[in-house]
Amino acid sequence: MDRTLSPATLKTELADNLILDVRRATDRDASTEQLPGANWKDPEKLADWADGLPKDQDIVLYCVRGGSVSNSVVGALQAKGLKARFIEGGIEGWKAAGGEVVAK
């Protein structure tokens, strides 16, 4: 399975995915917005929540810019057999592509 998903592709599939915000707590706290329907999960506590995710649903996650945080979380989730990908460019790439954000 690919590790990334383009913002353009996600726009057509948004409703079909479980959306996870995995920005570090300080980055999330500094922001006023998130993707619609996103649930925040602390990437530092991945071991506490990863096993509770559905194995039969596509999972899309994002951090600030789609870098090391998203990449490491996707790697860990895929290693557990989950269908996880991250948004290329993170929430910043999503917004730059005209993706909708909402107040958190």
Specify the residue positions occupied by each region the protein language model found.
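Rhodanese-like catalytic fold shared by cysteine-dependent sulfurtransferases
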Residues: M1-L18, R24-V60, R65-K104
